[in-house]
Amino acid sequence: MDNRIDQAIIWITVLALVTAPLFFSFFDFVAVFNEPKVVMLHFTSGLVAILWLWQIVLNRINSRSATENQLNWDLLSWVGRNPVRWALIAVGIWVFAQLASNLLSPLPIISFFGGDEARSGYNLYDSLSLTIIFASVAFRFRSFKTLQILAYTLVITGTIAAAYGIAQHFGWDAIGGNGGRTRVISSFGNTLNFGGYMVMAIPATLAFAYKKFNRDRTALVIVTLALALQISGIWFSGSRGPIVAAAVSIISFFVITASLGSKKEILKSLAMAAVATVITAIVGTLPSEHGDVGLQRVISIGNQFSAETSSTDIVGGLSGRFNIWESTLKMATQWDLPIEEPTANKLLRPLFGLGQDMYVYSFPLAGNPQTTLALVDHAHNYELQLLIEQGFVGFLAFVSSAVLLSLSVLVMVQRMRRSNNGIDTAGFLVLALSPAMLGKMVELQTGVARISDLAMNMALLGAAIAIYEVVNSRLSVEEPEQAASNTIKPSSINISASNQMVLGSAVLAAVLVTAIATSIFVSWDLRRLSASRTLAVGYEAPTVEERARTWAKVQAQAPERESFTFTLFEQYLSTAEQQHALGNTKEALRLLNIGRDMLLEYEQRDPLEHDTQIGLMRAATTMMVWGHLEFAQELGDRAIKQAE
């Protein structure tokens, strides 16, 4: 039973890592492009957590007959000089910072579930789900076999996504309707996320030059073609940050290869990379509507450092990011929110931030003046995003874990080099997973990560822990003297508990997590997915009456979905104005009041949402134009609130 649960957890984790990059609203089967990714992440991570806890319960039940079944755990002895275990401590602090950030949030419900489905990856629900994926890989993928499965997953999903992106570049996309885009998005919904995923996939695919296959030449040809597809994909994404990060990941790949392999092995991967690059160049010269967008974007990289502008408007490229970063750092000195809050909360803001998913609401308070209504919902730097939303505790915890895991790669490569084993299975795994992690860390400095690429990123962080433990254990067997010298004496930080106490705690945790996770998934994810499916089916109904019934049903199913609510409000407002122009004033008032009431209901959940406030001001303005001057005060109050 224990082994079956282990296998279930491993394959459910793999399912999460496949669906995060590849799932979306195929053939418009739901109304929101990336919703299937989010739902599957919540489902798989919840299932992993439930299985894991019940496995602990079963193990404790089975150990009742054992003579030594008491829990004894010495923290410092366990951590020792092991960098990845210190990284696990840092991740634990990071999770604590997220929980504290949510508790202190001015809008805890928004911080837990998120305000907008387009901002995935930063609310607590998404963050905890991603952390479970991280933990699953870190603790359950501790064998060469499971780590190879992870490497295969990254390469295969990256190749499929790249092939789809290339098809979009040349005008074909019968699946998602995104053919002929200037910069392709593949199955990700955003060019940056697609490019960010290729940053991880490219070095992992390069590593397969050293994988032993039964038919080496055929396999090498397939791997080279896969690499060519991935390089072409990131090229057609036109994402400068990911292209630079991919270069860093490739450089780190060859640095590690030079440390572990022979000249012949180095030349083998260099040749594969060269052939793949030539294929990419050929693909890039093929005629398409938008030409060679990759070349144009790469040439413009140098201009990003010399571009000067006196405008404070948010624009693309580095100048826009410098603008955002300047305002973000200003936010980290003020910690202002657009609502009044208790003094105690204000004092804790530097430690635990403004609250998860709160960046978008506070940015206008520190941002430079804009000539347009440009909302910034991300710092375009992952660490700065964490700093603002999770404070210095969350920021330092994540940075510490990332630094420690990067250090673990260096330590591991040095030990492997001394062992003189060359690029064996362990070396292959280090090359497949470590440069991918390092390259992604670079990409996060200018990217806008979402769960489509964050899921694999978290898996790679977990893999850094797993592979270090596996390789370190193997090398310790080969170097027993050094292993003995690394033994840490017992410390005073020791946790002891009887098996009965551990069993009772595990049962309580398993029951609570099962009930809470199931309840949240059914009441939140499935309900919203059902509403999205209803809208997708009825969106193009043949009659106005059928479409109206569809929208009414969707609104009743998911009144908290701002994108649905605001779109429906605009429909009511437009129809009301048409009816008023035709002289049907009563019908016009009825329709406008229905739309206004929807926004007022949504305002109770999220009083800071920008579109909602704009919509309510438009409703008040329309009422005044129609002669209802009693809305003048409301309009004035809302206008002042928005200006402030």
Where are these regions (language model features)?
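TM-adjacent membrane-interface loops and short helices in multi-pass inner/ER membrane proteins
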Residues: 190, 310-376, 383, 390-397
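Transmembrane signal-anchor hairpin modules in multi-pass inner-membrane enzymes, especially those
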Residues: 1-118, 132, 136-156, 208-226, ...
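Amphipathic alpha-helical repeat scaffolds of TPR domains
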Residues: 523-541, 556-583, 600, 604-627, ...
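Alpha-helical transmembrane segments of multi-pass inner-membrane proteins
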Residues: 1-23, 43-56, 88, 92-102, ...
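Helix-turn-helix repeat elements of alpha-solenoid scaffolds
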Residues: 540-552, 585-597, 629-638
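Alpha-helical solenoid repeat scaffolds, predominantly canonical TPR units
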Residues: 222-223, 227-230, 534, 550, ...
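Juxtamembrane membrane-water interface segments that cap and precede transmembrane helices
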Residues: 22-36, 108-117, 175-187, 306, ...
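Peri-membrane helix termini and adjoining interfacial loops of integral membrane proteins
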Residues: 63-68, 106-109, 169-181, 298-299, ...
